A protein has these predicted regions:
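Start-transfer (signal-anchor) and selected internal transmembrane alpha helices
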Residues: 1-40, 244-245, 452, 466-476, ...
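Active-site-proximal, structured, solvent-exposed surfaces of multi-pass membrane proteins
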Residues: 5, 10, 14-16, 665-795
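Membrane-embedded helix bundles of polyisoprenyl
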Residues: 27, 131-144, 150-231, 244-264, ...
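Active-site lumenal/periplasmic loops and adjacent helix-entry segments of GT-C-fold
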Residues: 37-145, 150-182, 206-210, 293, ...
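Periplasmic/ER-lumenal interhelical loops and adjacent helix-loop junctions
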Residues: 53-57, 61-76, 106, 241-242, ...
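Soluble catalytic regions of membrane-associated enzymes that act on cell-envelope
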Residues: 113, 471-713, 717-725, 730-734
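Contiguous transmembrane helix-bundle modules in multi-pass membrane proteins
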Residues: 194-195, 214, 345-506, 752-795
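Membrane-interface helix-loop-helix junctions at transmembrane boundaries of multi-pass membrane enzymes
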Residues: 234-243, 333-356
């Protein structure tokens, strides 16, 4: 007799008993229902909190227009179009800036079928689609491991509405990964068990294109998955099978490398990598609470991404730390664990648990990124769902005792609510260390209620032929209720600060048409993130992790923090002149605060469309020349607080570049490195303005400038340096000099000069060749196996 939980030939799509489309429909309907109350409250423009509001809505809307050419015009100099985004921080290559977020997502490309203005209202329908696709993929994977196909439907719902997925609605594009991953694992199983060819290569390519960052983790997980299954002899491995699998792996990577090569070259310039000298940090987390949080995240429903119920230490917020299965938690998986010996699923989950508890192993899922994340948990969650349905289907498995045990573990967390605490300052005593008692009660209540209902259903209906269907209905009802509460806690927790989000975003579209013509940057003061994207303007306030890497060196050199956002303080007034900021935008309610903080360089321009606009009297058009320079070594010896002032006076060259280009400028005297006051800044702006380009035009592949010089000199542009740029002076290619620790300059001769900077992602030619070549090979490879299969049938 075949063991429960082992691989078997699945039903094919279209057969009478197959329930693929039923699963897709159930997942879509459930997702639509729990989003519906918020969709109605928000009038169709669903906004949540944090990253969803600031990034995801803005990115989807902006990129829809950018791809369609709705932003800056095409360059008249080149045939290269739609490669450079001015609205992304100080300007960034669009492929590298958005390949982590959406550039390779099939859901984003599907959204291009709709007008740009619809996108804020399509965020929920797109999420519903993602949940539906996730359910379909999980069903395809799980049906191999069950006897009754209804259990595959149940397992798919457990995966689709896991704590990980619901939590990551906050990040939106993480749900894309959850949706597509099951197809990758299904195709691997098809290759291992059924010798089915080409599908694995296809899904490798799709997942790689969708998100290169998550794909790194998928490679690690697939290696664990393959080795664990091989170690338990779940399939027969031959040299031919291994060779074909390796070939399809490489072929899939080749097909999916269109975004990979440019992304890798960009990441190599990004300082957010692991510190290889961390010693104990390889093996242990610095806070005990981190371990407790990891363990609890596998058994209890998740907190809101930006609110913790219990933990006061460790890296907890925004980490996607949840492996919770709706209703049953790990009860079914633990039951399976106790019932099976030498099972591959146990080894996979056990290995993942070890990886979760060891920092260096956990970071392996993110190419040794130094920041802690748990954004790979969706992969073991799929295996946990398989273990759960296998335990439920096997009538000999004890389901009740694991459920009771996990219930007691949940109840044990009440200790955090009643432990006595003495205030170190007053000496008074209180009870509990909870950070958000209300959320904790909701999370604990759902966890215990789910297990109680799970035990009741198992005791009452386990012997019934419709047990799986009844449990599926309970899981979906539970998922609906918990998702409404979970999203509600996150959404209404920021309702006061985000209630005017829609108004500000839509008003920005009106203001876009009322700002003066010209190509300049803007700044904002105490309004919502990424308003510059709605204005289609480069803005100093920007929230996004993957802007041009040189920005991550330019800002810190000035003492401006740059991690996942750019937000130079208003007190750093000299940055506004250096970066060619002409207008600052705030709301009428914040005008008094702005007036108290701002320097004398702002004059009131007008109030319109719900905004108050100020003009920078020290505005310097983009593209200007200097009289002085100083070396990077000298620059690093100056005080960070006044470096922006210094950059208005002198160009900073590396020691090597100073030896080449220093002859065109005068070395800045030591005495002039200290006279860095507002009054001297105004004079420096006046001098730079006198040397500025007469024409500066932004386009969607870079920019064009025209300038007249009295002598041969470097012309500076406050555009982030990127290896993808090529500069042309009067039609001739010229070298680009990296200056000011991250910006650009180019040497121009005396007289009139026409300057064009054209951007193509570094490595794009190689990536295109790999992708096109891979597709050709894959088509031939697939055609061969289709032909062979038909010939075999005829024979």
């Amino acid at each position: 007799m075949e063991r429960s939980g082992t691989a078997r030939q699945p039903q094919l799509l279209g057969q009478k008993k197959d329930k693929f489309w039923l699963t897709v429909g159930l997942c879509a309907l459930t997702a639509a229902l729990f989003f519906l109350p918020f969709y109605i409250i928000d009038g169709g423009f669903f906004h949540y909190a944090g990253d969803f509001n600031s990034q995801q809505i803005s990115f989807y809307r902006y990129m829809n227009g950018f791809i369609k050419g709705a932003g800056y015009p095409d360059s008249a100099f080149t045939s290269v179009h739609n490669t450079f985004s001015w609205a992304t921080d100080l300007g960034s290559g669009v492929m590298n800036a958005y390949s982590f977020y959406l550039y390779g997502s099939p859901f984003f490309w599907f959204s291009l079928l709709f007008p740009q203005g619809w996108l804020p209202y399509l965020m929920v329908p797109l999420l519903v689609l993602k949940f539906a696709v996730a359910g379909g993929g999980a069903y395809l994977y799980l049906r191999r491991y069950v006897k009754n196909i209804d259990y595959a439907v149940l397992g798919a719902c457990l995966y689709t509405f896991s704590g990980f997925t619901v939590y990551n609605v906050f990040f939106n594009h993480f749900v894309d990964v959850v949706a597509l991953f099951p197809y990758l694992l299904w195709s691997l199983d098809e290759a291992l068990y059924n010798d089915r060819r080409s599908w694995f290569a296809f899904w490798v390519a799709v997942n790689l294109v969708n998100n290169y960052f998550f794909f790194i983790g998928q490679v690690v997980f697939l290696a664990i998955y393959f080795i664990c299954k091989l170690s338990t002899r779940d399939f027969r491995l031959t040299a031919k099978k291994f060779g074909l699998l390796a070939f399809e792996s490489l072929l899939g990577v080749a097909m999916g490398s269109i975004l990979l090569v440019p992304a890798v070259l960009s990441i190599l310039q990004n300082p957010r990598t692991i510190d290889l000298s961390s010693g104990w940090g390889f093996l242990t987390y610095s806070k005990v609470q981190q371990y407790l949080a990891i363990l609890v995240s596998w058994i209890m429903p998740p907190d809101s991404p930006y609110l913790t119920s219990i933990w006061s230490e460790g890296v907890i917020k925004w980490t996607s730390m949840s492996a919770y299965l709706p209703l049953c938690s790990l009860a079914g998986a633990v039951a399976y664990w106790k019932a099976k010996c030498g099972d591959s699923k146990k080894r996979i989950v056990g290995t993942c648990a070890v990886f979760a508890l060891v920092p260096i192993l956990n970071s392996a899922f993110y190419a040794l990124n130094s920041s802690y994340y748990a954004r790979w948990y969706y992969m073991p969650v799929l295996v946990l769902a398989a273990m759960t349905v296998n335990a439920l289907e096997d009538h000999n498995t004890d389901l009740d005792s694991p459920a009771r045990g996990i219930s007691w573990l949940m109840i044990a967390t009440v200790a955090f609510a009643v432990v006595p605490v003495q205030d170190s300052d007053t000496g008074s005593w209180s009870f509990g260390v909870l950070k958000n008692p209300g959320q904790y009660c909701a999370v604990l209540g759902f966890g215990l209620l789910g297990l109680l209902l799970y035990r009741y259903l198992c005791q009452k209906w386990r012997g019934d032929s419709r047990f799986a269907q009844r449990l599926t209905a309970a899981v979906l009802a539970f998922a609906f209720l918990f998702s409404v509460v979970h999203i509600g806690i996150g959404k209404f927790g920021q309702w006061y600060t985000d209630s005017d989000l829609v108004k500000q975003d839509t008003n920005a579209l009106l203001l876009k048409n009322d700002l003066s013509e010209g190509d300049y940057r803007v700044d904002t003061y105490k309004i919502h993130d990424n308003i510059g994207m709605w204005l289609d303007k480069s803005c100093l306030q920007y929230f996004g992790s993957t802007a041009a890497p040189s920005i991550l060196s330019f800002y810190p050199a000035l003492g401006v923090k740059r991690d996942v956002r750019s937000e130079p303080e208003l007190s750093n007034y000299a940055l506004r002149g250096l970066l060619s900021v002409e207008y600052l935008i705030t709301t009428p309610e914040k005008q008094t605060d702005f007036g108290n903080e701002a320097d004398d360089g702002w004059e009131y321009a007008f109030a319109k469309d719900g905004y108050a606009v100020y003009r920078n009297t020290n505005y310097v058009p983009m593209g200007f020349a200097y009289d002085y320079y100083l070396t990077q070594t000298e620059y690093e010896e100056t005080a960070k607080a006044t470096r922006a002032n210094l950059l208005m006076r002198a160009l900073v060259l590396t020691d090597e570049d100073a030896a080449v280009y220093g002859k065109y400028l005068t070395h800045l005297p030591e005495g002039r490195r200290e006279e860095l006051y507002y009054e001297s800044y105004v004079q420096d702006c006046r001098e730079r303005r006198a040397t500025a380009a007469s024409v500066f035009q932004m386009n969607n592949s870079g920019f064009h400038a025209e300038i007249t010089l009295e002598k041969e000199n470097l012309v500076f542009f406050s555009v982030p340096y990127d290896d993808g740029f090529t500069a042309y002076i009067n039609g001739q290619e010229a070298d680009i000099v990296e200056v000011d620790e991250g910006l650009m300059a180019v040497l121009c001769p005396a007289g009139e000069n026409s300057i064009d900077f054209v951007y193509q992602p570094d490595g794009i030619r190689l990536s295109r060749a790999l992708t096109l070549g891979g597709i050709v090979v894959w088509l031939a490879y697939t055609a061969y196996f289709v032909w062979r299969k038909r010939r075999t049938k005829r024979a």
